[in-house]
Amino acid sequence: MKKSLIALTLAALPVAAMADVTLYGTIKAGVETSRSVAHNGAQAASVETGTGIVDLGSKIGFKGQEDLGNGLKAIWQVEQKASIAGTDSGWGNRQSFIGLKGGFGKLRVGRLNSVLKDTGDINPWDSKSDYLGVNKIAEPEARLISVRYDSPEFAGLSGSVQYALNDNAGRHNSESYHAGFNYKNGGFFVQYGGAYKRHHRVQEDINIEKYQIHRLVSGYDNDALHASVAVQQQDAKLVEENYSHNSQTEVAATLAYRFGNVTPRVSYAHGFRGLVDSADYTNDYDQVVVGAEYDFSKRTSALVSAGWLQEGKGKNKFVSTAGGVGLRHKF
């Protein structure tokens, strides 16, 4: 009897040790096709087409926490890409961190979503192609090796600050400062995310002395309806004298409504003509994405979408169309 009790206790130890560890992830893949036409004058200068089986952002992760007493908890997460095409390698290449959580809020260090990225509900699409998601306005979003503090919520309001060091910025070699806030009241919400960078290297021959970005998102979200509008403004002062100023303002909107198991969705984005080298330049764009999800269950959904993007206007423009179908499973 005593031996049986000892054996049962020993067998339970690994289970107890892993009780606070959660395995989670998403597998999503599909087929996408696209066609892009570059115009030069009245004629098409080049046409590119493509169709392929693609991974739509699959991931796998482990997370957990430990109660340290007095309301303080240690929290951790290790998350990585898990492409069905087998093209991803390495651990912790998505959001991965260790930190502390308590009544003071949450303090983490690791590879973390930027504050700007956490306002990214304006782009809810699962896609590989840039033409099947509002990816141009989402381009500045990133995960940074950084330290981040998130405050607790007070009357629906919470805030975040984040700092990324020079030596962790990789090829960009730029320290950056980030801040934002969230406000919720019933289904209504307002989000702000901003960043400021110094000595940012874009390419080998393009260096930015100062860069800042601001995004404001507002909308309504409940179990059936999601509606959101975003405005984003970027401004960069380049080091080279002949490229002294570069700025652009962008807007986007997304609307979705759930009918039973089906959720149709539409997004629109527009980039206003920006300033490059102190002169107007045709970097404006318009983009539309439409699609729907069908839920077979709480975990498995079918995806379908179509997109259109036009960059520039007049005789010199770039027009792309795309379509895709896919399947997503969460665990």
From Swiss-Prot:
At the top level, the lineage of the source is Bacteria
Q: How does it sit in the membrane?
A: Multi-pass membrane protein
* Position of the signal peptide: 1-19
Q: Do you know which CDD domains this protein is assigned to?
A: gram_neg_porins
Keyword Membrane assigned to the entry: answer is: yes
Q: Where in the cell is it found?
A: Cell outer membrane
Keywords, A to Z? Cell outer membrane, Ion transport, Membrane, Porin, Signal, Transmembrane, Transmembrane beta strand, Transport
Biological process terms in GO annotation: monoatomic ion transmembrane transport
Q: Name one GO cellular component term.
A: pore complex
Gene Ontology MF terms? porin activity
Where is it predominantly found?
Answer: membrane
What assembly does the database describe for this protein?
A: Homotrimer.
Xref: PANTHER family: MAJOR OUTER MEMBRANE PROTEIN P.IA, PROTEIN YDDL-RELATED
- Stated family: Belongs to the Gram-negative porin family.
Q: Outline what the protein does.
A: Serves as a slightly cation selective porin.
What is the protein name for this chain? Major outer membrane protein P.IB
Which organism does this sequence originate in?
Answer: Neisseria meningitidis serogroup B
